[in-house]
Amino acid sequence: MWSPIPGTLMRTSSLPAVIEASGNDDWKKRKEAQSLKRLEVKKKRIERRNSLACNTSKEAAGQSPKEMNANTDKLVSSDETIVSANESHSSGKHLVKGLPPKYQATITSEDSSSAMRKKPNSAFKAITEEQNSSSSVPSSGEAISSVTAPSLPLLSLVPITATLGSREDQSILGRAGARANGMGDVERRMMQEMPGVFTKGLSNGSRVEGFLYKYSKGEVRIVCICHGSFLTPSEFVEHAGAGKVDNPLRHIVVSATPNL
């Protein structure tokens, strides 16, 4: 049978006092040895720094004037090489080592743009000279004609003239368009289906324009653009101021261009 556990544990034995004292002494000795090593390391670092500073000062003091002049000449030559490299770099002749040609092109373009920014006066002078040369032209109309006339090739004008037709047809279209703007959709569609006509070869030389409303065998009706009235061919010719004509259809010409 197990005996019950007592409420408090009693200490049966302990280390002797001599052993505890010796352990504390060893720990203190270790700490002292570590601190001494750290101090030695710090002293060595300080001595090295002082020795390097002394050596550099001695070398500077021991140099002769000739050696000092040689060093200054080396510095000046290095500065000159840097300046020449910058000039060649700005002119686009300098190529950076280790870069492909496309990057070389971008570098030269950036250099040229920076050079233009640094020299705005030259660009401004060129602009002022161009303005002065343009101001010496006799008149603005002549200058515009001299500039715009050669800019348009003759071949580009051929299809334009072919599509527009003659000046007479253009005038018919212009007047018909002005009249069509004031009409409704139904009237505009009717006008698009009707060909344009105009008088020609009259004794008085007058010209009247209209639309061919009806052109059946038995009846021909023409709408006058001037007043919008429906007229027969003879009335249309009389409306032009030529009076009565034996054959009025000979003096009425149908336009080839489509109406609006």
UniProtKB/Swiss-Prot annotation:
It is found in: Nucleus. GO terms for biological process: negative regulation of DNA-templated transcription; signal transduction. One of its GO terms (cellular component) is nucleus. The keyword Acetylation does not apply. It comes from the Eukaryota. The keyword Transport does not apply. Its main location: nucleus. Keywords: Nucleus. Residues 50-70 are annotated as: Disordered. It holds the Pfam family TDBD. Belongs to the Ninja family. This is Ninja-family protein 4. It comes from Zea mays (Maize).
